[in-house]
Amino acid sequence: LDRSSAASDVYKRQLYNMAGKDRALADAICAAVKESAPGAVLLALSGSEMVKAVQAIGLPVANEVFADRGYRPDGSLVPRGTPDAMIEDEDEAIARVIRMVTEGKVTANDGTDIAIQADSVCVHGDGPKALAFVEKIGAALQAAGVELKAF
């Protein structure tokens, strides 16, 4: 097992995506969290099986949306390495975040609008412009009248 940071990130990402689709896995994760950290707020892909599992077990959940990722019509993320997986244009990504937060909608990669709940916005922090991007998103959300707060 490769325990490097990059490999660890891949495994976490895979587990996150798997738990978003597999209710039994999501239930197992929630049970472990409830036992070890009962006050923790779990982040889960908006509308996913993980959100349903967290709600069912009675833990606090934050529906997570992604600023710079494409969505499929079923609400899952477009897999990395495929067309439409990443939103490269910052202005487009910011506009999508504003719409997700204020209207509860995002346009999927087939052009349809899907319902989404945005309690938390994920921004990938591995790029050189990540902090500036987060600051722009925060300013745009505040300009749209959205209150930013910790949970």
Q: Residue spans of the language-model regions?
A:
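Catalytic beta/alpha-barrel core
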Residues: M18, A37-S46
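Charged helix-capping and loop-helix junction motifs
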Residues: D22-A28
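Alpha-helix-loop-beta-strand connector modules within alpha/beta enzyme cores
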Residues: A28-P38
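Single conserved hydrophobic/aromatic residue that forms the stacking wall/gate
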Residues: L1-A7, Y11
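C-terminal active-site rim and adjoining tail of enzyme catalytic domains
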Residues: V97, V101-V134
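C-terminal helical cap(s) of enzyme catalytic domains, especially alpha/beta-barrels
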Residues: A130-L148
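Active-site rim beta-loop-alpha module in soluble metabolic enzymes
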Residues: G47-K105
